[in-house]
Amino acid sequence: MSREMALVAYRNLLRSARVAFQGDMNTLFAARAEVRRNFESNRSLTAGSDELSKQLTHAEEVAKFLRENVVQGQAADDEGSYKLRIHEHTERGNNEDIRKGKGKSTLGRVKCCSS
């Protein structure tokens, strides 16, 4: 069972790296090599061990992070603007936390070292 779970996590990481680094072959090859190296270093973990489940959970979290939070950018011009490659898996927030605090600036209201 754990061998199958490790294989699923491995493939999921490779897919996520392919989505995150599409078109950037150097970074994609480096990510694939890193994934392979990490899985090879944990090959000796025994099935059902706590360490194996921690490593599989970590692999799932990394795959999710790569897929949803990594965005590629290319310089669009000499003025410092970039064109971002946002794909269908990219997480898009609604900025509710920012809107809640709208108009409530705390800067300048706190006096440091005054009595």
Curated annotation (Swiss-Prot):
GO terms for biological process: mitochondrial respiratory chain complex III assembly. Its main location: mitochondrion. One of its GO terms (cellular component) is mitochondrial matrix. It is found in: Mitochondrion matrix. Belongs to the complex I LYR family. MZM1 subfamily. CDD domains: Complex1_LYR_LYRM7 (cd20267). This is Mitochondrial zinc maintenance protein 1, mitochondrial. InterPro entries: Complex1_LYR_LYRM7, MZM1/LYRM7. Interacts with RIP1. One of its GO terms (molecular function) is protein folding chaperone. Residues 1-20 form a transit peptide. Residues 90-100 have a biased composition (Basic and acidic residues).
